[in-house]
């Protein structure tokens, strides 16, 4: 298979983007529109594609800035998945969670996947591909998702979106 068999876009430089600055983080304070605009104007000078890891307010602001500023950037949009299964192999000890946390995470993950579908429909001219999960099945992760569940999420997204869908994981588990 060739690259062009999957994507109807040109090969161009790409980079993962997270606009968080000192004191900002996912789930906490996020960059302002002005900060995101400043970043993306710089990013667009050297890259044509960016990857975003999750659907949250920061992501929506990034997409809004790309659209409102007419920036020549396309986005691989991701849905970040939280742990649905304990992973005692996590080397930093973060892979073991209380049962109720795992149940809550599964509900959060479904909302994240549904939001991915919604935002992909909202920005089809910017979002060129979709990624479900980020290192969610590797043996060392602290946010392990069972492979059948990951596949289920991917199939749900594929059913409702026209963009290509993938999962971002290390090749070793496969």
Per-region residue spans from a language model:
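Boundary/entry segment of secreted carbohydrate-active catalytic domains
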Residues: 2-38, 42
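Conserved, mostly hydrophobic/aromatic
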Residues: 15, 50, 130
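A conditional alpha-helix N-cap/helix-loop micro-motif detector
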Residues: 29-33, 55, 109, 147
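Substrate-binding cleft of extracellular glycoside hydrolase catalytic domains
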Residues: 62-163
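Catalytic domains of carbohydrate-active enzymes, especially glycoside hydrolases
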Residues: 35-58
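Active-site beta-loop-alpha junctions enriched in small/polar residues
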Residues: 18-20, 55, 78-84, 132-137, ...
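Short, well-ordered alpha-helical microsegments
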Residues: 58-62, 173-174
């Amino acid at each position: 298979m060739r690259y062009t068999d999957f994507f109807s876009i040109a090969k161009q430089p790409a980079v993962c983007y997270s606009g968080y600055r000192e004191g900002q983080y996912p789930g906490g304070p996020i960059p302002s529109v002005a900060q995101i605009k400043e970043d993306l104007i710089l990013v667009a000078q050297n890259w044509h594609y960016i990857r975003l890891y999750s659907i949250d307010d920061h992501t929506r602001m990034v997409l809004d800035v790309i659209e409102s500023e007419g920036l020549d950037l396309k986005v691989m949009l991701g849905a970040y998945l939280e742990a649905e299964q304990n992973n005692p192999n996590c080397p930093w000890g973060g892979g073991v969670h209380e049962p109720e946390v795992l149940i809550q995470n599964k509900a959060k993950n479904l909302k994240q996947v549904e939001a991915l579908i919604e935002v992909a429909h909202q920005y089809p001219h910017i979002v060129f591909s979709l990624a479900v999960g980020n290192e969610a099945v590797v043996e060392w992760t602290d946010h392990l998702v069972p492979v059948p569940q990951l596949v289920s999420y991917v199939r749900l997204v594929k059913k409702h979106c026209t963009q290509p869908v993938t999962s971002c994981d290390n090749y070793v588990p496969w």
